[in-house]
């Protein structure tokens, strides 16, 4: 289930980098 969060986080980072503190990968 954690893998989904990581994958989702990466996708979200592209859309909302603010959540990651401005970290776009």
From Swiss-Prot:
Cellular compartment(s): Periplasmic flagellum; Periplasm
Statement: the UniProt record of this protein carries the keyword Transmembrane helix: no
Keywords for this protein: Bacterial flagellum, Periplasm
Span of the signal peptide: none
Record has Transport as a keyword: no
Gene Ontology CC terms: periplasmic flagellum
Subunit structure: The flagellum consists of an outer layer composed of repeating units of FlaA around a core that contains several antigenically related polypeptides.
Known function: Component of the outer layer of the flagella.
Protein's recorded name: Flagellar filament outer layer protein
Record lineage: Bacteria, Pseudomonadati, Spirochaetota, Spirochaetia, Spirochaetales
